[in-house]
């Protein structure tokens, strides 16, 4: 590197994942609140925002340990382009936040926030939450929730 040449590294770190201990319990059950389904919006987006404001949506969700969404995402911010939804941000972006909490017993909520960056093009947007819920028999089922569409000016 010091002489402008790449280094060659032949060492591969050992995979210790099977030897790691965890004291966290597994997920026993997820249940939506009465009269709700997984993916339902409990607190929706407003109709209009400007760059610099934060959109916040609360979804009925399952425990995130049901599926860690590696190589996937819990959150998508999408923009309507030529009649189709295009993803412009995911949960790995600095502008988004995904906050999960157990509300009561087996009920959970996910608060998804998007701090609209400066320079965001005007248009129609929405927030999508992807999650997974575990029933009493241990079956894990994916679901999707979508906010109302909103305008960014």
Indicate where each model-derived feature is located.
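Exposed beta-strand face motif in extracellular beta-rich ectodomains
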Residues: 123-127
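Short, surface-exposed loop/turn segments at beta-strand-coil junctions that are enriched for proline
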Residues: 113-122, 134
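Short beta-strand elements
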Residues: 135-153
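Contiguous segments within soluble domain cores/interaction surfaces
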Residues: 48-112, 128-131
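A cross-taxa feature marking solvent-exposed loop/turn segments within ectodomains of secreted
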Residues: 68-70, 120-122, 143
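Short, compositionally biased P/S/T/A/G/V-rich stretches that sit at domain boundaries
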Residues: 2-64
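Generic detection of short hydrophobic beta-strand segments and adjacent strand-loop junctions
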Residues: 88, 112-114, 148-152
